[in-house]
Amino acid sequence: MTAQIIDGKAIAQSIRTTLKQKVTQRRQAGFRAPGLAVILVGSDAASQVYVGSKRKACEEVGFESQSFDLDTETTEAELLALIDECNANPSIDGILVQLPLPAHIDDSKVIERIRPDKDVDGFHPYNVGRLAQRIPVLRSCTPMGIMTLIKSTGIDTYGLDATVVGASNIVGRPMTLELLLAGCTTTTCHRFTKNLEQKVRQADLLVVAVGKPGFIPGDWIKPGAIVIDVGINRLENGSLVGDVEFNVAAEKAAFITPVPGGVGPMTIASLLENTLYACEQYHS
């Protein structure tokens, strides 16, 4: 068996095209374009690349993007004050604060300062709680994008054994909630998990998000499984690889996401979808 590649790049581009059409229709009907505030603190190279991609995507679909690039020395109080300004600005529908933040700033305090109806990253406890209660509104972008990828396979998720490897607030935990909502019997693995191999081998649907190259050996994959690899790791030779041993896994799985070009583009597409949703449902 050779797995079908789930082309996140193509699916994300299709979403962007649809969003661009919706923004054009809004403008033609006399409504404003959605507005997204993107806040970057410090000069972390990877964060600058991610923020650049998000700003470019906003421009492509016709959103109004406001950029705030702050020095590493910016205080927590200064950042919170900027968030308050964005919360009060009626032309801003979504607020994105690029993580990680410098060590002297409390991530949780910053996330909770963003109004839940402008939390287009889907990190606010209110929005995560809505997902846990099975009434999601603004959903965490990476898990939301992954669900779109899974739906693209045409596989019915109800009753599938799903395993999530990684329990971060950004991916693993909300991913578990998304899969429960989709009718899966879901196991979440973390650093204290015993017999990880067994739990991976039983998975009809496997999502891996640990940030370690080749962490899951390809021969652990259940034949016919769907494999979603969230990891993006740069090796010493400059190449990018995921958390799953791709070449071996691709011989056993039915569907698999590549790295790059799988989950990454979908995270940004979901951010754009959330921003339009916030604009239409809450602010316009």
Curated annotation (Swiss-Prot):
Q: Which domain of life is it from?
A: Bacteria
Q: Where does NADP(+) bind?
A: 166-168, 232
A GO MF label: methenyltetrahydrofolate cyclohydrolase activity
The chain's disulfide connectivity reads none
GO cellular component terms given for this protein: cytosol
Q: Which reaction does it catalyse?
A: (6R)-5,10-methylene-5,6,7,8-tetrahydrofolate + NADP(+) = (6R)-5,10-methenyltetrahydrofolate + NADPH; (6R)-5,10-methenyltetrahydrofolate + H2O = (6R)-10-formyltetrahydrofolate + H(+)
Query: Per the UniProt record, which EC number(s) apply here?
Result: 1.5.1.5, 3.5.4.9
Query: Keywords, A to Z?
Result: Amino-acid biosynthesis, Histidine biosynthesis, Hydrolase, Methionine biosynthesis, Multifunctional enzyme, NADP, One-carbon metabolism, Oxidoreductase, Purine biosynthesis
Pathway listed for it is:
One-carbon metabolism; tetrahydrofolate interconversion
Please give the biological process terms from Gene Ontology that the record holds: L-histidine biosynthetic process; methionine biosynthetic process; purine nucleotide biosynthetic process; tetrahydrofolate interconversion
Q: Which InterPro entries match?
A: Aminoacid_DH-like_N_sf, NAD(P)-bd_dom_sf, THF_DH/CycHdrlase, THF_DH/CycHdrlase_cat_dom, THF_DH/CycHdrlase_CS, THF_DH/CycHdrlase_NAD-bd_dom
Q: Is Iron-sulfur set as a keyword in this record?
A: no
| Record's subunit section | Homodimer.
What does the sequence similarity comment in the record state about its family? Belongs to the tetrahydrofolate dehydrogenase/cyclohydrolase family.
Q: So what does this one do?
A: Catalyzes the oxidation of 5,10-methylenetetrahydrofolate to 5,10-methenyltetrahydrofolate and then the hydrolysis of 5,10-methenyltetrahydrofolate to 10-formyltetrahydrofolate.
Instruction: Identify this protein by name.
Output: Bifunctional protein FolD
Q: Which organism is it from?
A: Shewanella frigidimarina (strain NCIMB 400)
